[in-house]
């Protein structure tokens, strides 16, 4: 099995978990999305990170210390990821997903507001 420690997907998962600790909003569609789009071995971890969606979708003020983490998440989603060796993974579906397009757009808007 491939070592995932340096994989950018795991990097994002870990950052999202950090963010999720401060938010308790539950998003049912997050669980549905990950079960269809992530490899089974990391889907469970991702489901625990619904706070990432809460931060990107809600209108709450983002703490200054969170801005850099959000920026890294956005940059990671934009980059051409190294695909993991798992036939279940469908990076293209994530790339083309309206759900993730909206998360990227919301995150950009929130970061722009922080700069004003």
Question: What is the predicted role of each segment?
Answer:
Residues 9-17, 71-74, 100, 104, ...:
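Generic structural concept
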Residues 25, 83-86, 116:
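Intrinsically disordered or highly flexible coil/loop and linker segments, enriched in small
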Residues 1-53:
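Short terminal alpha-helical segments
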Residues 49-105:
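Amphipathic protein-protein interaction modules
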Residues 20, 74-81, 111-115:
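A structural signal for well-ordered alpha-helices, especially hydrophobic packing surfaces
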